[in-house]
């Protein structure tokens, strides 16, 4: 298949591109920076410079790429959690989840694409007495978390409006290139395993929402394990 990978230069996108290529897919990978095009080519992608906020540019990119499916791995978190500008980064990321996802979905639908796999987050469930599953309620959108919760809801609604929309609610990412480094913070997911999950979901998952994280008392990923073989222990060979 021809895969339009939005966010190919990100932490997950850099891992996912070679996984997709290894099983025979062609990857059209996006970046906002012309400086990253060479790196994407090395990974095996056909690079496209486009900004998710540029609806017209994104539409042109889709029409030129003619993809069979879309994988959405876009994030915009330039500042670490201990930065005084972290709140600014959260606001930017929230806008990307809302507007960027909306533009991706519109372009995909215009290009006749039915299947989209998109990243979301698994750490905004309302507290409960057992491990949270995909049908459990999210936190109410209030206080400091309101912007993030509202943005996640908008992202998921947009993706699930696709005929074959698949949402992967990742735990806190860790591994090389993440803010957490090699230290997992539960519910956690290594970036290698997150990329592997997206690759599996592309062809195996049914439309819907999946938790994707390591075993944790607060979160169940049983649905992802059962439906498409999610393996939290997956790592690239050194």
Which positions does each model-derived feature cover?
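Catalytic loop of short-chain dehydrogenase/reductase
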Residues: 125-157, 174-182
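N-terminal Rossmann NAD(P)H-binding glycine-rich loop of SDR-like oxidoreductase domains
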Residues: 3-25
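C-terminal amphipathic/interface module of NAD(P)-dependent oxidoreductases
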Residues: 46, 50, 55, 203, ...
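Alpha-helical substrate-binding/gating segment
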Residues: 173-177, 185-210, 215
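Conserved Rossmann-fold NAD(P)-dependent oxidoreductase catalytic core, especially the SDR/UDP-sugar
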Residues: 81-144
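NAD(P)H-binding glycine-rich loop region in Rossmannoid oxidoreductase-like domains
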Residues: 32-98
